Structure formats: C-alpha cells, structure tokens
C-alpha cells in the first residue's frame, strides 16, 4: 500500500493523532503501547471483540454491519487518526476497513503477520523469526514493549524497600504459561523445579511473578523451589511489581513460551536464562537468535554458579517508531528489510 498524503512532510509527527486497535489480550496492547510510547504520541485505544463466525474467521472477514463502521457515533468514525497501529488477528478486519474508509488520511501499521498479505497496511512489523518479508515489512530481533532505556533508568533510581531488603544477587523468575503452540508436560515441570532448586542452592534471593496465563501448577513449582530463600512472590493481589522486578534483578529467568517477557528481560542488559520445553519452530528460531546475539542462555537442569555475561540491551520499539516516522514523513519511500 502506498501512502500519498502531501500534508505529512510539513506536519510534525508529535502532533499526530493515533489509534491502537487490539483485542483484549494484554500482550497485544503491550506491543502497540511500546511503539506509540516511543513515538511520544497520545492515543485512543480501540478494543475489538468480534463474535461468532467473524471471530472464528478473523482476519479475513469485514467488521459486522451491526458495528456501523465509519458511521458517526460508532466506535470507528471520523475524524480519522493520522496513524493507526493494530496487533493480533482479531484487529485485522478493522485496520483493513480503516484503510478503505480513511485512505491516505491514515498511515496504517500492523504489528505481527496479518495473514492477509502485504497490502494490509502501509507498514508491517514482524519479529525476525517470522518469515514474512517485503518492501513494507521491517523486522527486529525482539518484540516491542514499553520498557525503554529511560523507563528502566527511572525505575532504578528508586528501589522499593521490600526489594532493597533482599540480599544480592536478586534473581527474577518471570512465569508465562501454556499456549496453543506450547505445553508444559509433567516432565517439564519437574525439570523446571530441579533447575530452580539448583539456583536456590546458590543462596540468591528471588523476585517471582506469574502472568495471567500462568497455571497454578507452574506457580507452585516456583513457589516450592524458592521458599527456602528470601523472596518476593507476587500472588496476584494489588499492583504487579513486574516493572521493579525487571529493573532491580541481577539475573533473570524466563519461560520460553513468552516472547514478550523474554523481549522485556533482554532490554535490561542483565543475564537472562530461558527455560525451554518443547518449542514451535518460530519460538525455536527466536530463542536461537537471542542466544547467538549473546543476550540469553538456556537454563540447565542444574547450575553450579550464576554466570555473568553482558550484551547491548535490545529495544525494538524505538527502531519501529523511527521507521514509522520516516515513512510517515516521506510517503512512498522504500523500507529496509531489517531494523536489527
């Protein structure tokens, strides 16, 4: 899709109005917010929830007529945004409809493979482990998120008292959970428990947080393995201390199912161990690339010491934001195939 709005070259992107279009999955909004935060834009979040056959057959169908797309008073109505960013298959019918209604007025961006072709948006981002490529496709090694260098630096300026009281080294354990492509067999849980117990034997403290996808059996494994050591284990009440855990951990352990959490861990510049069960081909390519880059290492069944290594922190959001800004100001310009 070629954009030809002549007004953009003279308009600051900082004055652009943005829409974020996602379903109700937190991980989708995390990626969109990371990019729009890097652009320093105000935005309106448009959460979509197609029903029935439209949910089943997304991303290929149009929004339902009952949603009155484009009509005054509906959730999707003029004035159209300058920039729209969509993530997830349920959002694709809406970004495609927006392109038809707004035309060159709106610069459209899709994060992740839309499955509906390169013409879906003006710009498409996919992680390197996705094989989609094209003139309007850019890639980065990790996924975008909101933990920028500035945000992490700000978090590190003031350490919460309960974290400061923990002896170092502080090991963060970031728990994901099963997905359609990723399952935890009992043997995997047992192996994870042994690995964490070997870490506990090295006398660190722990910062443990599950996610919304984390099943009780996975949380229990981390609970049992770390309870002999000083720790903070977030049980779901109140605000998740995850941002402070990221900022103040000396070493991080993350389950391989979560590309978002692994990407966030690799923004810290701290050693990241990844616990892997059976991986899909995409996940395997992602984690292999991170190991080759030097950000992560596989969590072994047993550790005799906590290894230390360094790498340049990975931040995808500002790279994607820079490409959006360049493309938005220079309609029709070519895009590099990679921002890594």
Segments predicted by a language model, with ranges:
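Short internal beta-strands
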Residues: 45-47, 126, 206-212, 276
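Leloir-type glycosyltransferase catalytic cores
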Residues: 288, 292-340
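A donor-sugar binding/catalytic signature common to diverse glycosyltransferases
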Residues: 24-25, 242-283
């Amino acid at each position: 899709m070629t954009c030809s709005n002549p007004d953009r070259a003279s308009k600051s992107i900082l004055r652009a109005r943005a829409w974020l279009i996602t379903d109700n999955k937190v991980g989708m909004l995390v990626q969109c917010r990371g990019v729009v935060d890097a652009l320093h834009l105000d935005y309106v979040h448009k959460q979509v929830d197609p029903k029935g056959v439209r949910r089943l057959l997304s991303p290929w169908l149009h929004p339902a007529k009952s949603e009155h797309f484009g009509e005054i008073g509906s959730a999707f109505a003029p004035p159209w945004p300058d920039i729209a960013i969509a993530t997830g298959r349920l959002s694709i019918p809406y970004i495609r409809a927006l392109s038809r209604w707004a035309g060159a007025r709106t610069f459209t961006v899709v994060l992740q493979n839309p499955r509906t072709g390169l013409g879906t948006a003006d710009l498409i981002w996919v992680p390197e482990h996705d094989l989609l490529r094209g003139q309007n496709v850019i890639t980065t090694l990790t996924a975008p998120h909101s933990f920028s260098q500035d945000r992490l630096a700000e978090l590190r300026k003031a350490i919460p008292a309960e974290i400061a009281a923990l002896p170092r080294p502080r090991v963060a354990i970031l728990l994901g959970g099963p997905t359609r492509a990723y399952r935890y067999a009992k043997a995997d849980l047992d192996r994870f428990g042994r690995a964490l117990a070997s870490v506990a034997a090295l006398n660190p403290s722990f910062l443990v947080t599950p996610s919304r996808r984390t099943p009780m059996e996975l949380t229990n494994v981390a609970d049992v393995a770390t309870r002999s050591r000083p720790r903070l284990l977030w049980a779901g009440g109140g605000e998740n201390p995850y941002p402070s855990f990221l900022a103040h951990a000396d070493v991080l352990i993350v389950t391989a199912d979560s590309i978002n959490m692994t990407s966030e861990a690799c923004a810290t510049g701290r050693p990241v161990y990844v616990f892997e069960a059976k991986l899909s081909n995409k996940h395997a390519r992602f984690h292999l690339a991170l190991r080759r880059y030097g950000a992560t290492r596989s969590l072994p069944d047993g550790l005799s010491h906590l290894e230390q290594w360094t790498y340049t922190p990975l931040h995808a959001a500002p790279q994607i934001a820079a490409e959006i800004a360049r493309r938005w100001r220079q309609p029709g310009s070519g895009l590099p195939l990679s921002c890594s």
